[in-house]
Amino acid sequence: MQRLSTESIQSFDAGSTSADGDARQALGDDGVVCLRGAFEASWLSIVEDGIVAALAGASVDLEVVKREGDKGQFSFSSGAWQTVEPFQRFIFDSPLADLVWPLLDSSTLTLFYDFLLIKEAHSDSALTPWHQDHSYYPLDGTKVVNSWVALDHIPLESALRFLAGSHSSSTLYRAVDFDDPSAAYRHARSELPLPPINQDDRILVTSLQPGDMLVWWSHTLHCAPGNRLDRRRAAFSVNWLGDDVTYNGQPALDTYIDPLLSSGDHVVGDKFPLVRQSVAPNG
């Protein structure tokens, strides 16, 4: 992965009553923000219970990859909340939704999907290439965010990197095939290639402690290195939709598709439940 000069992601204390406005501004400016100390150890323990269940077969969309030459494997699971009860508890009962919702400037908050990723010790080749999440989604609109909760201490050398401000134009780039970034992705929505990432660009990164949470817009370009550490590097992320998002029905992975929705529909239903909604004033 190319070495680039970096700046720190703007960070705020998740427990501060004044953090919402500042964090929302940082997210709007840079495309990513960090909320420190978002979750206590008791909530992380619930996620760990979910990991045990998911790896034991409760997740119907679990993949385990061990690349040639790596000592460790890379495991990931998508859309497991309906079959992994501890994940469901974390998503609906923890402070998660109430931390994320104010950042969207939206009258609603809808659960899109969850994503578990575990890079075991010395999964050196399990890097994540530069990409944007939105290019994989059958969605129109801009209020789509990923809330990414660190389960381990993540030092700078294994942390996510973000291209500051890359969300601002809502440009949709060509989706990247993670197994072979040079290959065409099967569900590509755009043929516009990713812009070159240069030394002059503002690359944002920060180390994380367990319970810290990154939040970024789905149009924000980001990447991550493999895990060269002697220990696990794991996170549990939950993706959310705001009130301007509609379904467009384009081909995508099953996790993102609901056959009960039609093009132009607001994305809500049993698969994508409404979690928060503003109460309209009387009269």
Where are each of the predicted segments found?
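Short, conserved beta-strand element in jelly-roll/cupin
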Residues: P138-P155, S207, V215, N239-G242
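Non-heme Fe(II)/2-oxoglutarate
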Residues: M1-D13, V60-V65, G69, Y173-D177, ...
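Active-site region of the double-stranded beta-helix
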Residues: S107, H134, T142, A150-L160, ...
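Short, charged/polar surface micro-motifs in flexible loops or helix N-caps
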Residues: L96, S106, A121-D124, H153-L156, ...
